[in-house]
Design a protein with these regions (language model features):
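C-terminal transmembrane-bundle signature of multipass membrane proteins
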Residues: 78-86, 142-221
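Hydrophobic transmembrane alpha-helical segments in integral membrane proteins
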Residues: 1-19, 71, 119, 129-138
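Internal transmembrane alpha-helix with an interfacial aromatic "cap," most often the third helix
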Residues: 19-29, 54-65, 69-104, 115-122, ...
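Hydrophobic alpha-helical transmembrane segments of multi-pass membrane proteins
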Residues: 9-23, 34-59, 71-81, 110-117, ...
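Non-cytosolic membrane-interface motifs at loop->transmembrane helix junctions
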Residues: 62-73, 126-137, 190-200
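Membrane-interfacial loop-to-transmembrane alpha-helix junctions, especially the N-terminal start
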Residues: 30-45, 96-107, 158-171, 220-221
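Membrane-helix boundary elements
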Residues: 1, 109-133, 187
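Intrinsic-disorder/low-complexity, polar/charged segments
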Residues: 33, 58-64, 127, 158-159
C-alpha cells in the first residue's frame, strides 16, 4: 500500500502543480476576475496537501490520520471553491425569484450524496479525531458541491455568463465526489478503486483550469 500511495500522491502533486502554475500565469494579472484567482488558489491548496502527503510518506511510511496540514489543504481548497461560486457568482446570478426555486432545491442532491458517503467514514473503523476532521472536510465539500450543481443547471443569463462555466462546474463537482471517495477508500483500504480514483483526480486536476479559461474567454461582459 505504501508504494501505491507514494507513487500516486507524487503524480497528483505534479499534476496539481502544473495546473496551479498555469492558473497563476493566466489569471493573476491586472484586470482578471477574483473568481478565477480564487479557484486557482483552491488548486494551490490541493497541491500543498499532496506535497504534505508525499513528505509524510517519505519520512514515516504511512499517511497520518486526523488533523494535519494535508487535511487543512483540502479544507482550504473547497473553501476557496465555495467562496468563488457563492461570493462571486451566485449573488449576481440568483435574485431570489420564486420561479427559480426549483434550481435552489434540486442542487441539494449533491450535498446529500456527499453526506451519505461520509456515513461510511463515520461508521468506519478509524479514530474519533479522524471522523471529526473528515466531517468538517465533508461539510465544506457539501457546500461547495451544492453551488457547483446549482450553477450547472441554473438558467443562463444574458451574455452567456453561466453557460460558459458549466463545464468547469461539472469538473469541480466530480472533484468533490472523488475527494469524499478518497476518504472512504483509504479507511476501507480498497486499493484498486483508490488507484482508479487517483487517476481520475489527476485528469480532473489537469483539465480544471484550462476548461475554466476556455469558458471565461467566451464571456461578453
Amino acid at each position: 500500500m505504501y508504494e501505491i500511495l507514494m507513487y500516486m500522491n507524487t503524480i497528483m502533486f505534479f499534476c496539481m502543480a502544473v495546473s496551479f502554475t498555469y492558473g497563476v500565469v493566466r489569471f493573476f494579472k491586472k484586470g482578471k476576475a477574483l473568481y478565477l484567482q480564487m479557484i486557482v488558489c483552491g488548486m494551490g491548496c490541493m497541491m500543498l496537501s499532496r506535497a504534505y502527503h508525499v513528505i509524510t510518506l517519505l519520512t514515516t511510511g504511512v499517511l497520518t490520520e486526523g488533523f494535519h496540514v494535508g487535511r487543512l489543504g483540502i479544507m482550504g481548497s473547497f473553501l476557496f471553491f465555495l467562496c468563488a461560486n457563492y461570493g462571486q457568482v451566485d449573488k449576481l446570478l440568483d435574485d431570489g425569484a420564486k420561479e427559480n426555486r426549483k434550481y435552489r432545491i434540486i442542487p441539494l442532491v449533491a450535498p446529500v450524496l456527499i453526506w451519505l458517503g461520509y456515513q461510511m467514514v463515520l461508521f468506519g473503523v478509524t479514530t474519533v479525531e479522524n471522523k471529526v476532521v473528515c466531517g468538517v472536510t465533508a461539510a465544506l465539500i457539501m457546500f461547495a458541491s451544492y453551488f457547483n450543481l446549482k450553477h450547472l443547471i441554473f438558467p443562463d443569463v444574458e451574455f452567456g455568463f453561466i453557460r460558459n462555466i458549466r463545464n468547469y462546474n461539472l469538473i469541480a463537482l466530480i472533484l468533490a465526489v472523488l475527494s469524499i471517495g478518497e476518504m472512504i477508500f483509504l479507511i476501507l483500504e480498497w486499493i484498486v478503486p483508490l488507484v482508479i480514483l487517483y487517476i481520475m483526480m489527476c485528469v480532473v486536476s489537469l483539465t480544471m483550469i484550462p476548461v475554466l479559461e476556455r469558458g471565461v474567454k467566451k464571456w461578453t461582459i
